[in-house]
Amino acid sequence: MAPVANLPIKTTLSPANQTELAAAVAEAYAGGSAIYPIGGGTSLDFGLPAKTPGSGLSLGGLTRIVDYPARDMTVTVEAGVTMKTLSELLAAEGQRLPLGVPLADKATVGGVVATNWNGPRRYGCGTVRDYVIGISAVDGRGMSFKGGGRVVKNVAGYDFCKLLTGSLGTLGVITQVTFKVRPLTEQFTLMACAVQTTRQAEKLLAALVTSATTPVAIELLCGTTWDSEPALKTLAGASGPEKLYLVVGFEGSAVEVEWMTGRLHDEWCALGIEAPITIGDAADFWKKLVDFPAVGNAQPADKDTAPLVLKASLVPSGVTPFIDALRTLDPPASIQCHAGNGIVIARLSAFPKEGLSRALVGNLQPAAAAHHGSLLVLSNPSGSEMTHQSVWGGLDVPFALMSAVKQKFDPKNILNPGRFVYV
């Protein structure tokens, strides 16, 4: 049973199947009571704090593997299946879903889709929206609906797959998902180099755009977490408080990966990089990259020590200037950037002395906006100063249209009320 300490619920409902789940939502609709969907409990801090009393709705009973025609390279599972279980199922057939989800042993399929969580491989492999081809859900009236199907090239009906992805369970409780999957690759390798300044990092990132290689991940790292990482301690060429680490991932056949790592090594050396390395235990380091946003944030969290975690979405050229802004605010902050996609995730070393609102609204949000981006709070276990502006920032989205869609799917506003961007 997922921890629910930070939700205002009196009881948690545990339906055993999709029919029982729909009935539970219909009953809540009739009584006008709030419903809070709960998967693995790994992202319950995301969004505004829930204030409306209601009931939790556990997806723990929805764990069926509905259909897996491996030759068609699609899989249909219920929303309570964990990402680890799904990965093991696919691996047995030489396949995978390359999303890179933190805490995969707890995170559920429904939760991953609802939060639109994408890991370091998004640069080369895409995002959740690229893999969801069919979806079933229950709306705020307890009515079941579905979109897409089990065929990759299915264009029938409304695109509920993309609509529900990232909706935080506010339009419907996801009950079942169909993914298209990919083959496992023969080899995966991580190359790394140390960088002296953000200016030098920007030059290396620009060079990757014209590189003959095709990375699947481009990670720019800095801060206390990465300075103490054993796999990076052997790197030469950088020292001092401004140093960063650039980690690039390649996958494919053994021949392809060997050629790309050799080529990138030569390209980096030509740019003045000293002794780039191939990380020995790529799988272990990769797990640290994937889990970084959730370290210290797995439920239940110690509110006094769990970090404040922020996420900025920018144009890629804004990554290094935003790192500078973060370091000005909190020099020891641990930072991970999916640099090829303009995503920056920061775990602050301490709660801002000037307060969350002033640090974010007055400082970091304008820094993100300067690079056509936005800033979100992924996790703030303290719960302090969690306002719409501080959590969601100045999002440039059509709020009126989004609210109209919300009204159609959830007319009584019982699904995760008050947690998303709707005003």
Residue ranges and their predicted role:
Residues 26-50:
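Active-site beta-strand/loop segments that form the cofactor-binding cradle
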Residues 39, 80, 248, 346:
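Residue-level signal for inorganic ion chemistry
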